[in-house]
Amino acid sequence: MVQRMTFDAASYTAQLQDKVTRLRDLLAPFDAPEPQVFDSPLQNFRLRAEFRLWREGGERHYAMFSQDDKRTPILIEEFPIASLRINQLMPQLKAAWQASAALSHKLFQVEFLTTLAGDAMITLCYHRPLDEHWHTAANKLAADLNVSIIGRSKGKRDVIGRDYVVEKLDVGGRTFSYRQPEGAFTQPNGTVNQKMLNWAFEALGDRSDDLLELYCGNGNFTLPLATRVRKVLATEISKTSVNAALSNLDENAVDNVTLVRLSAEELTEALNEVRPFRRLHGIDLKSYEFGSVFVDPPRAGMDPDTCELTRRFENILYISCNPETLAANIAQLHDTHRITQCAMFDQFPWTHHMESGVLLTRR
């Protein structure tokens, strides 16, 4: 059965307060200040969406599955939490595949990626090779919808247009342009992401020393934070993200960043002079005067050695997608650093997930 997605907007404030209370309780043992709270739009905040396709009543529908029931599809006609652009594209794409066997044959998954700047890309995933009939239909679809189209089939990828979207975000009075590649991680809530960037920009402040950044991704935070310091050494392990970050640095004429493809654990070994790394050839780590470190780790948080590494710095600016691992990392650092600023970002409304940020300063 086709199901309309519903939610009670009036309950948003209560849900938001529950998250703030949870963060406050987790950080209470560390005498954290009251968190600044950055809310989200109630609808149309999510810039990307992924749907399986499900056949019912002789046609394919967008479908999702509950965490509690992976077998029973929830058929989707509209998706209010997704961006307006995604909601505009959903029926247009559905009409296109219904009218074209070349587009619909063995199509099993659709992914949308959009930006606040209005760019859009659609990825179509198939259980078959893509032939010239598909290319003809997909080229027309891309032109009709003014989007880029990615066709994926058994490890192969066909690109019509670009394999990335362009986002523009305003931070500290400047507009930064970001290339966001298909398949790479990007923050899903663009409005809240912009709030996070501005909070981090203000928390770091203007400094005359250098910044170490771990887990830099496509340069989401790197670009604005680089304007606050003398030099940045940034690390990222994903090759796709590294390439996007390099393009973004060039596009925005940010020339004081050195980017190396190392994991946080490997950089820890390099700084501790445990062993040399060929990927650091020509980079003099001793030339940096690090005063601050910025970390935005995965849900598991920082491993103990990386956490210990951050203790060396006067300031630790930490963005977290998991408040429990954030609290565990702070517990390791609490004897030398105290929380001077704290924030909660409602990146994921209508879920229990949240982003949080802290600035830790050496005692």
Curated annotation (Swiss-Prot):
The keyword S-adenosyl-L-methionine applies. InterPro entries: MeTrfase_TrmA_AS, MeTrfase_TrmA_CS, SAM-dependent_MTases_sf, TrmA_MeTrfase, U5_MeTrfase_fam. One of its GO terms (molecular function) is tRNA (uracil(54)-C5)-methyltransferase activity, S-adenosyl methionine-dependent. It catalyses: uridine(54) in tRNA + S-adenosyl-L-methionine = 5-methyluridine(54) in tRNA + S-adenosyl-L-homocysteine + H(+); uridine(341) in tmRNA + S-adenosyl-L-methionine = 5-methyluridine(341) in tmRNA + S-adenosyl-L-homocysteine + H(+). The keyword Cell membrane does not apply. One of its GO terms (cellular component) is cytosol. It is an enzyme of class 2 (transferase). S-adenosyl-L-methionine binds at residues 187, 215, 220, 236, 296. Its EC number is 2.1.1.-, 2.1.1.35. Keywords: Methyltransferase, S-adenosyl-L-methionine, Transferase, tRNA processing. One of its GO terms (biological process) is tRNA methylation. The active site is at residues 321, 355. Belongs to the class I-like SAM-binding methyltransferase superfamily. RNA M5U methyltransferase family. TrmA subfamily. HAMAP family: RNA_methyltr_TrmA. PANTHER family: TRNA/TMRNA (URACIL-C(5))-METHYLTRANSFERASE (PTHR47790), TRNA_TMRNA (URACIL-C(5))-METHYLTRANSFERASE (PTHR47790:SF2). Dual-specificity methyltransferase that catalyzes the formation of 5-methyluridine at position 54 (m5U54) in all tRNAs, and that of position 341 (m5U341) in tmRNA (transfer-mRNA). This is tRNA/tmRNA (uracil-C(5))-methyltransferase. The gene is trmA.
